[in-house]
Amino acid sequence: MENEMHRRITPSYVQFLTSFSNGLDIFHGTLALYGYRYSFKRDETHAQQPFNLAWLQIEKPRNSTDDMFFIGTYNWDYSFLYVTPDQKVHFCHREDATSLFTWDSIEDMLLSEIKRIYTLFDDRGVAIDPKHPTTPII
């Protein structure tokens, strides 16, 4: 995957991909962390793959710099998450890489976001208020 991206994957995200999950989809894309997609076939065997991490390194917002490693998106407005060299995770809008919110680590981001996003859905997984943004900053 690093060869395809022509860059190294940030260490904390390598740890996530190799020890926890090859990408992650929380509440059907409310928050998606990208990973290694080995096939683009759409049959049942290949349908559960993550979004391709390499794509995020190409389709970046303005103001982004080479030291920002993009790892995920929110489907509400296609805003981004990225990791900086200090391994902090940042939230930004899709058009501008200026950090609007920061977590100290991928683990901190996951714990707080899963808890927060969980409160936006009922017991059946349906959005309580479909018009309410699902991003960390409104």
Each PLM stretch: what is its role?
Residues M1-Y78, I128, P133-I138:
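A surface-exposed partner-binding patch
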Residues A32, F69-F70, K88-H90, D108:
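Generic structural signal for residues positioned in beta-strands
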Residues S79-L81, F91-C92, L100-F101:
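Short helix/loop capping segments that flank catalytic or ligand/cofactor-binding pockets
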Residues V83-D86:
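Short acidic-glycine loop/turn motifs at beta-strand connectors
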Residues S99-R124:
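Compact, glycine/acidic-enriched structural inserts
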